[in-house]
From Swiss-Prot:
Protein's UniProt keywords contain Acyltransferase: no
Entry's Gene Ontology cellular component terms: cytosol
Disulphide bridges: none
Family: Belongs to the Fmt family.
Organism in which the protein naturally occurs: Burkholderia lata (strain ATCC 17760 / DSM 23089 / LMG 22485 / NCIMB 9086 / R18194 / 383)
Family annotation (InterPro entries): Fmt, Formyl_trans_C, Formyl_trans_C_sf, Formyl_transf_N, Formyl_transf_N_sf, Formyl_transferase-like_C_sf, GART_AS, Met-tRNA-FMT_C
Name of the featured protein: Methionyl-tRNA formyltransferase
Pfam families listed in its UniProt record: Formyl_trans_C, Formyl_trans_N
Gene (UniProt): fmt
């Protein structure tokens, strides 16, 4: 089916690429795609295009990669050029998903039907940069995707639609990301169909209660504090897969932990002490309970099940992982 509603799309990672693909496949014209500049990545630190750029180029969509959209920012000339490009590109609505750049009011005012954001949480919970990670880390039973009409605030716009998803007990950020990306893609296509048909999308202001912020994930958060309860550490490991991983330090070597589950405590061992090193998993004493680690990675190695890891990197009961410094 071919649609007439013209959509400018702004987004960067895989989460956004799923939405762009759905919009394109549904038949909406996309006269312009905005995405962040190519960044160095990988071991060779070669410039790599974003997932959104790769999709757009493969499907013949015009792409712009301004480093900023704020005239008063660090790149005023580039921002001015991008804003002029937006003004000169005929379109009706802008869809924004994990773009990573601030949109000033001047940009929000350009599309006739405004800017719609696809956000990976049930707003107003987990506004900000890392809503998927933080929902798992906090032990939330459910999360979802919210479509909102963007305003100048940080994820504060009126809500158009939402979809709720239960968080599975073994959910990682990687698996939850893919489920939420699919939901976001479905929601935005339905919303664009409605907007084209009705000329308006009803929206409800976000409630004042229940606001939380999902701070960007930092590499420093990877270190596991064994003084914490085992269930908290298990959530941390799941939340930080694929980035930055959970890290435990043994004799100066940083071992990444990729899969773990809380189990009952084994005796009175001090936090961080390995109490069992078996093919089924490495059990480590925690502040309360213990953590059975079933997937590990040594520096420079691959993720391995505990059985394979132990075959090449033996661990033994009584060894103790270092405790992180308490801030």
């Amino acid at each position: 089916m071919t649609h007439t509603l013209r959509v400018v799309f702004a987004g960067t990672p895989e989460f956004a690429a799923a939405a762009l693909a759905a919009i394109h496949e549904a038949g909406f014209p996309v006269p312009l795609v905005l995405t962040q500049p190519d960044r160095p990545a990988g071991r060779g630190m070669k410039l790599q295009a974003s997932a959104v750029k790769r999709y757009a180029v493969e499907h013949g969509m015009p792409v712009a990669q301004p480093p900023s959209l704020r005239r008063a920012g660090k790149y005023p000339a580039e921002a001015a050029d991008a804003i002029e490009l937006l003004r000169s590109t005929p379109h009706d609505v802008m869809v924004v998903a994990a773009y990573g750049l601030l949109l000033p009011q001047e940009v929000l005012d350009i599309p006739r039907d405004g800017c719609i954001n696809i956000h990976a949480s049930l707003l107003p919970r987990w506004r900000g940069a890392a809503p998927i990670h933080r929902a798992i880390e906090a032990g939330d039973a459910e999360t979802g995707v919210t479509l909102m009409q963007m305003d100048i605030g940080l994820d504060t716009g009126a809500m158009i639609e939402e979809a709720r998803i239960a968080i599975a007990p073994d959910e990682t950020t990687a698996t939850l990301h893919d489920r939420l990306a699919a939901e976001g893609a479905r929601l935005i296509v339905d919303a664009l169909v409605q907007l084209e048909r009705d000329g308006v999308l009803p929206a409800t202001p976000q409630p004042a209660d229940g606001v939380t912020y999902a701070e960007k994930i930092g590499k420093h958060e990877a270190a596991l504090d064994w003084r914490k309860p085992a269930d908290v550490l298990a959530r941390q490991v799941r939340a930080f897969d694929p980035f930055p991983g959970g890290v435990a330090t043994l004799d100066g070597a940083a071992i990444k932990l990729w899969a773990a589950e809380p189990v009952a405590a084994r005796g009175e061992a001090a936090p961080g002490t390995i109490v069992e090193a078996a093919p089924e998993g490495v059990v480590v004493a925690c502040g309360s309970g213990a953590l059975r680690v079933t997937q590990l990675q040594k520096p420079g190695g691959k993720r391995l099940p505990a059985r394979e890891f132990l075959a090449g990197s033996p661990l033994a009961a009584g060894q103790r992982f270092a405790l992180t410094d308490v801030a």
